């Protein structure tokens, strides 16, 4: 199994290969929202708590191209991450 591409809170760009999973590190995974400018290139999954563990938001690299992920924190501040998929 290939490990996910980890995107830290200070990164504004990331590279991934088709099929890679993305793990977006945030302070508050459950209350942070992530959107993708192109869900056909990078799909996103929101952070969650399943009762036994808390998971960061993440995504999946679906096809070659570029998508901008917008991370909206609980205080409504945002940051963007440009993900290039090859």
What role is predicted for each listed range?
Residues 1-86:
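Extracytoplasmic soluble-region selector
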